Amino acid sequence: MSGHSKWSTIKRKKGALDAKRNKIFTKLIREITIAAKIGGGDIESNPRLRVAVSKAKVANMPKDNIEKAIKKGIGGNEGVEYFEITYEAYAPYGVALMIKCLTDNKNRTSSDVKSVLAKGGGSLGTPGSVSYMFYRKGLVVYNLEKYLEDEIMEFALEFGAEDILVSNNEAEVITNPDDFDKVLSLLRTKFKEEMAEIALIPENKISLNKEQAEKIILLIEKLEDFDDVQEVIHNLEIPEELS
């Protein structure tokens, strides 16, 4: 009986992990397809596609899936038109959210986002009400279990990075967006990053206690459960015990 119970638990956990992975792949495929449609299928000349493919590789997406998504984008993606929408919103305790979406149905997405925000104690803001709290920068993230903090700092600054932020065993290298490709190429001669993209960086982060932070994280996770939501950017300082 206990063996059967254990197997059932393993199956449930595996099913949940598979479902989560499939959801991530769906979002990444959509982003790759749109990037290829807008900027072409050449990774070297299409920065957005290059970032999308890099994310897909980090997520261990099969190469065949990536190539099919690019071909679909180049082919025009007939029959489906996606729209890019970024909702500005507030979570409880004044935490700012930028909810980036890719959708083929604006009304559905708007309704879903509003519903989840309302249930989680948040609300939609007006355009410009939240975006001013973030600035656009190049972001390269390294795992400090793999590399020495001092080593990353030394080379990143030498290669032209603007700043290096360290927290929760990660080093975040910040660059001017115009210098991002150059700095990343130089860094790749020394290190392998966990993530690299042009990102929205919060100007200031909000610190909350563990219970409050958990409420915000749950709201963000519920938003990201929707296929239409590609990413939720926030200005919450995640407590170390929750990272």
Swiss-Prot record:
Keywords: Cytoplasm, DNA-binding, Transcription, Transcription regulation
GO cellular component: cytosol
Keyword match Transcription regulation: yes
Gene Ontology molecular function: DNA binding
Principal localisation: cytoplasm
An annotated GO BP: regulation of DNA-templated transcription
Database matches in Pfam families: TACO1_YebC_N, Transcrip_reg
SUPFAM superfamilies according to UniProt: YebC-like
Localisation per UniProt entry: Cytoplasm
Family per record: Belongs to the TACO1 family.
UniProt cross-references to HAMAP family, sorted A to Z: Transcrip_reg_TACO1
UniProt name for this protein: Probable transcriptional regulatory protein BAPKO_0024/BafPKo_0025
Organism of provenance: Borreliella afzelii (strain PKo)
Lineage of source species: Bacteria, Pseudomonadati, Spirochaetota, Spirochaetia, Spirochaetales
